[in-house]
Amino acid sequence: LGAPFTDPMADGASIQKAGLRALAHHTTLADTLKLAARFREQDQTTPIIVMGYANPVFRMGYAEFAKAAHEAGVDGTILVDLPPEEDGELREAYAQYDLSVIRLATPTTHENRMKKVAEGASGFLYFVAVTGVTGAGSADPQAIAGNIEMAKRVSGLPVCVGFGVKTGVQAAEMAKIADGVVVGSAFVEHAEKAHESGDFAGAPRGMGALAKELSSAIRTITKP
């Protein structure tokens, strides 16, 4: 569940514009947690991860955010601009509510750095498949297969791959080497098209169809 931010430096055009639309309607981090709580009322089992940037969480206060996130039914966060060296206070707050601190690794993360990334991480490791922003380019599974294997070995955590995955075919290829696949921009683009055309009912239809495509493709994969 994406939390909008004014300076989303890791995101491509689609998610940047989505964030601007949300901010134009005065959407706050507290509103994002309210949305999580509404979802949790209907679904008590699907994990909820809030993804965004550190500044809004810092402004709310790590302890206050951790408490509010827990009460909303959130299971963890991905704060893409908060490095391991600076998240000690956050981890302390999260530990009180068993919230996961999900960290990121990239194709340029070497093994010694991976050990630091893995230290204190929980939930899963988010592996950025391309050097760039969200929605940019296409990921090459063969190019990162060795990185994924190393990340699993060093971290002891499940590794999910994101950035550059938009179709069922791409998701299936990534599922062969990873424990999960993260797709964001492709879903947001359905919302953008609906916003531009005024066909607001089209957004959930398009997102639902994409979710089925991705899920069906991944379920055909047999791990070696």
Residues covered by each model-derived region:
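Glycine-rich phosphate-binding active-site loops on the catalytic face of alpha/beta enzymes
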Residues: L1-P8, A72, G76-I78, P83, ...
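Short, electropositive alpha-helical surface patch
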Residues: V50-A72, I177-S185
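Surface-exposed amphipathic alpha-helices with a cationic face
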Residues: A36-E41, H70, R91-A95, A145-S155, ...
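Short beta-strand/loop segments at the ligand-binding rim of alpha/beta enzyme cores
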Residues: D43-Y53, Y94-A105, K152-F163
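Non-catalytic positions within long, well-ordered alpha-helices that form the structural scaffold/packing
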Residues: H70-E71, A118, K152, A175
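Active-site-adjacent beta->alpha loops and helix N-cap segments on the catalytic face
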Residues: F5-K17, A24-A37, V57-E64, L79-Q96, ...
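Catalytic cores of alpha/beta
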Residues: T109-E119, V161, V165-V181
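Expand to "…catalyze enediolate/carbanion chemistry for C-C bond making/breaking, isomerization
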Residues: A129, R153, K166-G168, A172-M174, ...
